């Protein structure tokens, strides 16, 4: 009888290597865990608060009121003829979604190190759940915005392009991916450089004032500043959002090309850094 030769098989459990780290099928298998993280985020965010989830609407309304006073009444910045409350609420809601993606995703490794060190699951599930949480908040705020939009539509003060609503869906998706890319880049770097968390908060605020959030792009006439605004990846989404729902805004193919290129590059860089850091971050956090 021939001797059976046994081969040694080594089974490795842990994160995949390099670009194979982004396994969409694996993430789909962990979809229940992702939703569990989403629920956890909401529970933690509104735990022991008097108004609870009502803060989802209160925060943008307070910001909108402040912008109406500061930029509309005192600074008297143009809103391209649009009602101030609609103009600022639109910018606040969309930018709030983007900034929450960056700020919350940037703490992925530092705030979840205890979970990561105890059990294996696709680490990318954590930042994705954060983006989904931000998206849910945005949708609630968008519902409020849409109700106000219908009020001003009945008055004849806005002219939405209803045929472009599908573009709005793609626009929000692109903003989420851009925020995810920026966030995971920062989260990967903060495993070694904790100071970045402080810098990011200031940087995101500075980025907001460098984007057409509280003012329209039409206000920027200086050639150099205009060029900077064009390559800003958040300019195209902001102006397109207003163009779809207000009928105003300056959008060009160059703006969208720049925005999509930046989104792709930052997301690719973020995923690459994330896949490298997740293997060793426990030793550095």
Model-identified regions with their sequence ranges:
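Hydrophobic transmembrane alpha-helices and immediately adjacent juxtamembrane helices
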Residues: 1-285
């Amino acid at each position: 009888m021939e001797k059976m030769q046994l081969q040694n098989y080594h089974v490795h459990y842990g994160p995949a290597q390099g670009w194979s780290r982004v396994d969409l099928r694996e993430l789909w298998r962990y979809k229940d865990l992702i939703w569990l993280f989403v629920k956890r985020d909401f529970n933690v965010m509104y735990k022991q608060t008097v108004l609870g989830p009502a803060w989802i609407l209160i925060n943008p309304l307070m910001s909108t009121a402040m912008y109406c006073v500061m930029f509309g009444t005192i600074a008297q910045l143009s809103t391209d003829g649009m009602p101030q409350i609609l103009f600022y609420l639109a910018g606040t809601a969309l930018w709030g979604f983007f900034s929450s993606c960056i700020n919350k995703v940037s703490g992925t490794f530092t705030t979840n190190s205890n979970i990561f060190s105890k059990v294996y699951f696709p680490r990318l599930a954590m930042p994705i759940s954060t983006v989904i949480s931000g998206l849910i908040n945005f949708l609630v705020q968008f519902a409020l915005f849409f109700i106000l939009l219908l009020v001003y539509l009945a008055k004849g003060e806005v002219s939405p392009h209803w045929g472009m609503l599908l573009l709005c869906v793609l626009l929000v998706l692109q903003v989420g991916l851009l925020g995810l890319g920026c966030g995971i880049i920062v989260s990967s770097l903060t495993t070694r450089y904790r100071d970045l968390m402080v810098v990011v908060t200031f940087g995101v605020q500075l980025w907001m004032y460098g984007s057409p959030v509280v003012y329209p792009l039409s206000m920027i006439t200086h050639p150099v500043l205009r060029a900077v605004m064009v390559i800003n990846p958040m300019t195209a989404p902001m102006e397109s959002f207003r163009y779809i729902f207000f009928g105003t805004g300056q959008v060009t193919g160059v703006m969208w090309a720049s925005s999509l290129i930046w989104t792709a590059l930052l997301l690719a860089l973020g995923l690459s850094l994330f896949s490298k850091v997740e293997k060793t971050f426990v030793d550095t956090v």
